[in-house]
Structures are given as structure tokens and as C-alpha cells.
Amino acid sequence: MAISSASLISSFSHAETFTKHSKIDTVNTQNPILLISKCNSLRELMQIQAYAIKSHIEDVSFVAKLINFCTESPTESSMSYARHLFEAMSEPDIVIFNSMARGYSRFTNPLEVFSLFVEILEDGILPDNYTFPSLLKACAVAKALEEGRQLHCLSMKLGLDDNVYVCPTLINMYTECEDVDSARCVFDRIVEPCVVCYNAMITGYARRNRPNEALSLFREMQGKYLKPNEITLLSVLSSCALLGSLDLGKWIHKYAKKHSFCKYVKVNTALIDMFAKCGSLDDAVSIFEKMRYKDTQAWSAMIVAYANHGKAEKSMLMFERMRSENVQPDEITFLGLLNACSHTGRVEEGRKYFSQMVSKFGIVPSIKHYGSMVDLLSRAGNLEDAYEFIDKLPISPTPMLWRILLAACSSHNNLDLAEKVSERIFELDDSHGGDYVILSNLYARNKKWEYVDSLRKVMKDRKAVKVPGCSSIEVNNVVHEFFSGDGVKSATTKLHRALDEMVKELKLSGYVPDTSMVVHANMNDQEKEITLRYHSEKLAITFGLLNTPPGTTIRVVKNLRVCRDCHNAAKLISLIFGRKVVLRDVQRFHHFEDGKCSCGDFW
């Protein structure tokens, strides 16, 4: 294979200007290939190439080494230079192209590799099993599903789609492009999936919020006696955290200790996150304190854990410990701190942390940080300040920011502002049923029934759908899910009879169903009461009372914010039945014990 002399001379003239500034001594060196390993910058690499040209070295292996250096830690300059070298070759081979593809897959504009890929295909160079992983990774990074599908078809034509290197990257490409079902089709075609393939599919499910499928596949993997590795554990732990599956999480912890995975900081951090999200804060603290080395992610996980459990002071003290040990905070650290302040009404402390994040640590606020600030202000009743904060943001506000404020308007019964906020939301997204429900509840609370009916019609015309309330509880290693309304029409099961009896006992202790929560003008109070009774969290708690020994903590995970009526009922349940109830909703944790909640009724 020959390299174009004219192109190399062009490179040389560009590189020669750097010679006098270089730290590389080439005077007594005979083999420039050996110099590449000593190279520290693109500038020095250019000088080595200049020396090689002066020495009449036109070896393809030398140029391949130059390209490898450029693509190892790609920048715009290094990839531009590598491409110049590649295109200067009269007969590049697939090995050198693979090096280019690896570089582009790590680059800010990964899809630039495809113009080069088309060129080599036109030259009759066929991709191999090392080509597809890099190209598919580029598609995954760029969320380029169509290009990924074309690569999948090409890999099938070449008989490489079931290759051990290609399969996992195909699965990853599809899941990163949010086509999890296609990823599963790829997985199911593998005759004997290896650990790497299982990891790719389990990770894909976990990242796309499909934890049940992730855990099901993990159990299948165990049934085939395949040993999970660090990547497996990280994905399974995140799935346990999403579901609130504490029993399985504890088993994973035992497995990690037995097989020495607890030496990995990432595994410990995932364990902290899992235990905290499953409601076992003490276990999370225990893991953290036993860690020999704690990085930013570990500290942040603990700060977030305390915040979500309403332990604002401990969250802030953890931050002080972190700084005293010279660990640099990141954006997650400050999300935890802002949430800690928000959940406990510490407005001024929250403002201070937000200011510090920008001015002292140089962290650019993300939409999540702005959302935390809106939550901080509005939850404390500073609704107009929150509205002004959103209006003056340096970026375009998203519906999420306005929705945070709308929820606070409901909590503080501010109908006028809620109407203004709803208009801003509907300008951006009018398909979210929950927005209509919140506004409708406010109208009902203020006896404006004509507006309730009108809004329900608008919601129907726009085909806006409300996400149904869903609560889950783990009993004997099985996660059981309940949806609001289950059993309203035919409450004949043992569970529903037990729920009816439980509500009777609650009423004897002073429980009064908050029928103002049910927005149906044509319903009488008894019908509204039945609707409240079959909220998903009440069903899950009742299931826990029926199926766990006396004294066992009942742990429930809900996909929405817990309503006021269920919150009041849970407090009484903890008192009457002597059970601690840990409820994780979309906002935070509620620890109910002896008739009280850890949130202090501030949520």
C-alpha cells in the first residue's frame, strides 16, 4: 500500500512550523515509530511526522500509528488531522478505518464517520466484526436510529449480526435510540447469550425505566449459571431502586460482598442509591461509612439520600464533611442540597447553595437545578417569586418548570395564578392530563363547577390522558402492583374486604375521607368516598398488612404524588396497627410512625 507523496508533503509543510517548539529530540533517532509512544500532544506528533518525511519514511504502519494516536483521545483538531492522514493514503485498509471509526465514536460529532464509511465501501473495502461496534456506538451516541438500522441490515448481509462483538453493540444502539423492543429481538435471536449480551439487554431495560423486564432477565441469567459482573450488578441495583425491591437488593448486596464486588466504588454507590430508594436509609449510611475511598458520586448519593428522606440537616452536614475532605461537588451534589432545602422550607439556605454552585464551583445550572429552585420557592408559598424566577430564566422554560409551580398553586389554593400558569403550560404542551386534573381540582375546591365541566370537555377534545396512580409493594421477593380504582366496581376479593374493614377502623379513630379531592359534580359523597378508598396506595398498604407478619415495616412505592387523603389515612394506619409505613412518592419519602409523618405534613 502506497501513500500519496504530495499529501504527505502537504502535511509536512503544516507540521514543520512546530519543529523549533517541540520537546522531542529527533536528531539521533532512527525509528520515528518509537517516538510516537513518547508523544504528549498533537503538536509533537506533527513534528514526528515531519521528521519521518524528511527521512523518506513512507511506511503504512507508521501512518497507522499516527492515526491511532489521534483517535485515542479525540478532539476536533486530532480527528481533523487523522482524517487528513487517512485520506492521503492511496489504499487504506479496514484496520486503519476501524481506528478512525473508534475515534469518531468518542467524538462530539460521531456521525461524521459515515461519509468516510461510504468512501471505503465505494472502494470495495468490506467492514469486519471490529468495524460495526464503533459505528453502532456512534449511532447510539447520536441517537441515529435509522443509520443504526441500516448497519444492522448490513451486518446481517455479511453474516456478522450474531458476532460476539457486534451483538452487544446492536442491543445498546437500539436501547439508546429508545427502541427497546428491537433490542430484545436482537437478543432473542442469540442462541447462547453470553454475560456481555445479557448485560447490554439488562442495562437497556434499566435505563429505559423497565425494571421488571431487567430483573426477569437477570433471573434468567442466573438460571443459566452465568456469573454476573460489575456491570450486571449496577444495572440490577438501579432496577431494584426503581421498583423499591428491597429483598432482592439485599440479596445483591450479599452477593457483592461474597464475590468481592464491594471493593468497587461504583458498586457501593449503587448500593447506597438502592437502599435509600427502597426506604432503608440506615443500610445506605452503613455502606457509605464503610467505604475506604469515597468519590464525588458516593458523597452526592448520600446527600441526595438524606434529602429525599427529609433529613435536610444531615444532608447539609454531609456536604460540609465532603468539602473538609477536599472532594469537589458536582451538579448532583447541589441537586441534593436544593431538594433538602425545598423539602424543609429552607428558602434562604437554598438560595445560598444555588449561588455557591455558580459563583464558587463554576457549575452551570441545568433545567433540573432551575426546577429545584422553583420547587423551593413555590413549596414555601412564594408563588409570585417562583413565577418571576421562571419568567426571567436565561433559557426557555420547559413545561416541567411550570408544572412544579402549578402543583404548588394547588397546595396553596391559588386559583388565579394557577390559571395563568396553566396557560403557559398549554402553550408548550397540552397533552398532559395531570395538568387539567390539578386545575380542575382547584375549580372544584372553589365551587366553580361550570369550569370543571368545561375543562373536562377541553381535556377530552385534546385527547389528554392522565397517568393512572400505581403503587407497588414487595412481599416475599415478589413485587405486587396496584392501580387506583382497582375493585371500585366489584370489590369482592379478600383484599378489598380487608380494605373496607380497615377504613371502618380508621373512621372509629377519627378518619374523615377528604371528598374534596374527588372532582365529579355528579357524584354524591358516598361515591366519592368509595373512589378515595380504592386509591393505589391504600390497596398496597392493605396488601402489606394482610401478607406480612405483625411489626413488619410496610414499604410502598407510588408513581405520583401521594394525595392528602391517603397521607392522612397512612398516619392513622401506623398508629392503629402499630406498623411503620414507608411510602416513596414521586417527590420524596414519607416515614409514617405512631400517627406522624417524617415530612411534618409539608410536601
Swiss-Prot record:
Origin organism is: Arabidopsis thaliana (Mouse-ear cress)
Q: What is this protein called?
A: Pentatricopeptide repeat-containing protein At2g02980, chloroplastic
Question: Family assignment?
Answer: Belongs to the PPR family. PCMP-H subfamily.
Effect of gene disruption? No visible phenotype under normal growth conditions.
Question: What role does this protein play?
Answer: Involved in RNA editing event in chloroplasts. Required for the editing of a single site in ndhD transcript, which is a plastid-encoded subunits of the chloroplast NAD(P)H dehydrogenase (NDH) complex. Not essential for the activity of the NDH complex of the photosynthetic electron transport chain.
From which residue to which does the transit peptide run? Answer: 1-38
Kindly state a single biological-process term from the GO annotations of this entry: mRNA processing
Q: Where is this region: Type DYW motif?
A: 508-603
Q: Which Gene3D superfamilies match?
A: Tetratricopeptide repeat domain
Q: Which terms does the record give in the GO molecular function aspect?
A: RNA binding; zinc ion binding
